[in-house]
Amino acid sequence: MTALEVADWRRQVFAVYSAVRDATDLPAAHDLWRRERDRLFAEHPSTPLLPEDRADFTGLKVRPYDPDWRFEVVVQPVETRRMEVETGTDGIVPFDLIGIVDIPGVGQLDVWRLASYGGGLFIPIKDALAGKPGGTYGGGRYLIDTVKGADLGAGAEPASLVLDFNFAYNPSCAYDPAWACPLAQPGNTVAVEIPVGERYSGSH
């Protein structure tokens, strides 16, 4: 893939999330998100699918929308610390912990800021279904990765975010081991099962 192809992928992802943020019909917005991601995975030169997986690709395994898994949460400040992730393609990528969020029935999640060019917020999630057959990706999923467009916006309260687990998705390394992705650490691992969002079958 070329730099221009990657830029086009990002541009389209940003556009999808912009449409989701503007939507008032959340199930319809979720369906748009699912369909557009299916299209990108199937057709785009920057798809993370391996060549041998593309011919049989019929769509990502995404659960139906459940409004009970949408939250607006206030980011509570904490003492900062740094996490450095070896990505292979981009070298060591630094993240700074900027806060935590408390999610009813789920638990606490760390909120990270990308501490390099572009900045951005990053919230991965690893739940009790991770690594189980028919469950979620063993390394966890992403809720928010704003530098790459995955951003559901701010909540109504100051310093708050919209976290909607229906939009949790697998990182690229779930589909192509050539990618090295930041994965959920202990502060982004919860003991409950999160049945919505994208599932994982080992290929697509």
Q: Which residue stretches match the model-derived regions?
A:
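Short Gly/Pro-enriched loop/turn and capping motifs at secondary-structure junctions
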Residues: 128-130, 150, 168-171
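Immediate flanking context of iron-sulfur cluster ligation sites
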Residues: 155-176
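A compositional/structural signature for long, glycine/proline-rich flexible linkers
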Residues: 1-131, 142-147, 156, 177, ...
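Ampiphathic alpha-helical segments that act as solvent-exposed interaction surfaces
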Residues: 162, 184-187
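Solvent-exposed beta-strand/loop surfaces of large extracellular or lumenal domains
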Residues: 133-139
